[in-house]
Every structure is written in structure tokens, then in C-alpha cells.
Amino acid sequence: MLNIYNTDLKTNKFEKIKEFKPGSWISLVNPTEEEIKLVCSNLNIEDEFIKYPLDYEEQARIDVEDDMTLFVIDVPVIEEDKEGKSYSTMPLGLIVVRDEFFITVSLKKNRVIDSFEKGRVKGMYTYKKTRFVLQILYLNASFFLTDLKRINKNAENTVGILKKTMKNEELIQLLNLENSLVY
């Protein structure tokens, strides 16, 4: 999915737009090949920086090439199934192109980008690239801390139950919570 956002320089109003214009933010969530080609042709860039974060195993890193900077960070993901919640991470790419465009790339929707798209983050301007990167990093760290607190609380509750009953279910649940901390 391809969305383009811009903050108007005069009014500072954050809005969704249809065209690529300098100072805008391009959000790519599980993009198709056509969407990747559209972004690359309009911004006159190679597709490799866009494709790196689409690899679920991509490592967090910073890469600078010509007039582009790529930040790959891990964002926390909560998935629910019949056994409860599981915590993991996935890569999120932040790309600054010639200090004109800001691109975010992720495999699926996530809380970090969703917070910005829905206007929940105050003082966010698409044309202030460094500030935007720092705001994303700060919000991402906040989500990690929140999730770690939840995991710790669940682990403590499960340990308390284990002390009383020692059943396999609680032991498996505790092991699953401990495995979440690896991410």
C-alpha cells in the first residue's frame, strides 16, 4: 500500500496527497512491485533501499549511498492467536532521499507508522527529516518499553500461578514469554 503525506509549509496542516512533491513522506506498507517502481521512477532512485526492509530477517543498520540514507530499525509487533499474545519484531526502513523526500517501508502495518499516519504524534512535519527520524525512534523505543513491561508483568503472574499449581500449561506460557524477550 502506497500513501503520500505532506505538511503544508504555510499552515503546518498534515494531509494525505496524491502526487510526489518535495518535503513529502511516502509510506509503503507491503508494497507491490508496481508501487516500488512508481516510487523509484518518480524519485529517480534505485529500488534496493526500498527492498532491504522487506526482508523479514534484515538486520538493524544505517547505510549511506550517494544522496540517500537508509535506517533499518526493528519495531515491536504483537500477534494474537488462540494461545494468546506473542511478541516479536520486524524491520522498518526509513529512507531520506536528497533531503527532499522521506520514505518508510515495512512488511505490514505497525503501531509506529500508524501513529504518525493517524496524526497522533504532535509536532510532526514531513519536511523536517531529522526530526521525523528522531520522533520515529523515540516512539519505537516507547513501544518497546511498554511491551517489555507487559511481558515482565505476564511472566510474574505466570510464575505466581506456577508456584501454586505446577501445571504444564503455565510452564509453557512462561517459556513463551521468556522467548519473547529474545527479540
List where the protein language model places each region.
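Peripheral, non-transmembrane regulatory/ligand-interaction domains of membrane transport proteins
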Residues: M1-Y183
